[in-house]
Amino acid sequence: MNTLSYKTVSANSATVNKEWVLVDADGQTLGRLSSKVAKLIRGKYKPNYTPHVDCGDNVVIINAEKIVLTGNKWRDKSYIRHTGYPGGQRSLTATEMFEKDPTRLIEKAVKGMLPKNILGAALFRNLYVYAGGEHKQAGQKPKAINLNDLK
């Protein structure tokens, strides 16, 4: 008796098909852009998604300087860090961080949406953020996609 068997496909480093994707951040809201980029990096839009494998795409983000924050977040949102010394807690507002380096806003938002382990660190290395419209990954021929088409 022959039965139909649907086996679960588990990806590994040999069977993963990684692509280069170009995302334009011009006019995009920070959180919505970051969550979709984190899903792209993680590989959740692919049918062979496997949680413990780096099966996502390499993502290049351009125009990070044109990102949008809603409400009063430019003034009220704070990024806190600690120097490691007693009384060494420091904080920056979103505006101050943006003036120092516009790419850090997107990088911190996406990194916070990835797993907090070795896989998350490896996935974060698949993200390339540029403040302007030019990028250094032209040799990889990234495919431009519209994030509004993704769920």
Regions found by a protein language model. Give the residues of each.
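Ribosome large-subunit tunnel/peptidyl-transferase-proximal elements
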Residues: 1-108, 118, 136, 141-151
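C-terminal structural segments of small proteins and small subunits
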Residues: 120-130, 136
